[in-house]
């Protein structure tokens, strides 16, 4: 059982208790801190849609520390990021691997960051199937289709040629923040919050 810290906020004569995630949400911060699955995707999408309804023009910050996970669940988050009108900045802390890196690159151009000791990893989608040969062939074709789709989206978001992304994702490809910046996955490596404020003021 995981413990969720509570935050007490005092306003005037009253006090209000928030779980830490609700308090962060109040500041338009969404945290992806686990494997990407259908449940996590639903929660992230719900938070993004809620924050857009509160203010469709104010920035939302998506902090990512994720090993990746389900492609379809990740694409649900990706499509929601693109669907809402509020700009979304992305920040990698710890690691953004696989679908985590894909979502890191999906932030608004100019607002994609990584902390200095974070790790980014990109690769092609993988899957294991058992059953009849015909069914295995069907699933293999779907994986190849998803591979091409993900690579084309990543090429678009990084500004790199499609063939470069295909080569970069052929195997597990671990990147430092500086290497991720060179590839176009992020725009800047942040050491402190002041770096982010300076970036936005420029």
Curated annotation (Swiss-Prot):
GO molecular function: ATP-dependent peptidase activity; ATPase binding; serine-type endopeptidase activity
Primary enzyme class: hydrolase
Originating species: Desulfovibrio desulfuricans (strain ATCC 27774 / DSM 6949 / MB)
GO biological process, one term: protein quality control for misfolded or incompletely synthesized proteins
Organism ancestry: Bacteria, Pseudomonadati, Thermodesulfobacteriota, Desulfovibrionia, Desulfovibrionales
PROSITE patterns: CLP_PROTEASE_HIS, CLP_PROTEASE_SER
Family, similarity comment: Belongs to the peptidase S14 family.
Subunit structure: Fourteen ClpP subunits assemble into 2 heptameric rings which stack back to back to give a disk-like structure with a central cavity, resembling the structure of eukaryotic proteasomes.
UniProt-annotated catalytic positions: 98 (nucleophile), 123
Major localisation: cytoplasm
Protein name (record): ATP-dependent Clp protease proteolytic subunit
InterPro entries membership: ClpP, ClpP/crotonase-like_dom_sf, ClpP/TepA, ClpP_His_AS, ClpP_Ser_AS
Compartment(s) where it occurs, according to its Swiss-Prot or TrEMBL record: Cytoplasm
Keyword annotations: Cytoplasm, Hydrolase, Protease, Serine protease
Annotated GO CC locations: cytoplasm; endopeptidase Clp complex
Gene assigned in the entry: clpP
EC number(s) stated in the UniProt entry for this protein: 3.4.21.92
CDD domains for this protein: S14_ClpP_2 (cd07017)
Function: Cleaves peptides in various proteins in a process that requires ATP hydrolysis. Has a chymotrypsin-like activity. Plays a major role in the degradation of misfolded proteins.
Catalyzed chemical reaction(s): Hydrolysis of proteins to small peptides in the presence of ATP and magnesium. alpha-casein is the usual test substrate. In the absence of ATP, only oligopeptides shorter than five residues are hydrolyzed (such as succinyl-Leu-Tyr-|-NHMec, and Leu-Tyr-Leu-|-Tyr-Trp, in which cleavage of the -Tyr-|-Leu- and -Tyr-|-Trp bonds also occurs)
Transmembrane segments annotated in the record for this chain: none
């Amino acid at each position: 059982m995981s413990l969720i810290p509570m935050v007490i906020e005092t306003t005037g004569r009253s006090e209000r208790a928030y779980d830490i995630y609700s308090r962060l949400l109040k500041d338009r911060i969404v945290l992806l801190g686990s494997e990407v699955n259908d449940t996590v995707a639903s929660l992230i999408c719900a938070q993004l849609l809620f924050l857009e309804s509160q203010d469709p023009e104010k920035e939302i910050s998506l902090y990512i520390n994720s090993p990746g996970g389900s492609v379809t669940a990740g694409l649900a988050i990706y499509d929601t990021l693109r669907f809402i009108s509020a700009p979304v900045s992305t920040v990698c802390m710890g690691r953004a691997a696989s679908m985590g890196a894909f979502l890191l690159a999906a932030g608004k151009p100019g607002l994609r960051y990584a902390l200095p000791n974070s790790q980014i990893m990109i690769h092609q989608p993988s899957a294991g199937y058992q059953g009849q040969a015909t069914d295995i062939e069907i699933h293999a074709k779907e994986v190849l289709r998803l591979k091409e789709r993900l690579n084309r989206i990543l090429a678009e978001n990084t500004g790199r040629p499609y063939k470069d992304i295909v080569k970069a994702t052929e195997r597990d490809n671990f990147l430092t923040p500086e290497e991720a910046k060179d590839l176009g996955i992020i725009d800047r490596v942040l050491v402190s919050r002041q770096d982010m404020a300076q970036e936005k003021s420029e």
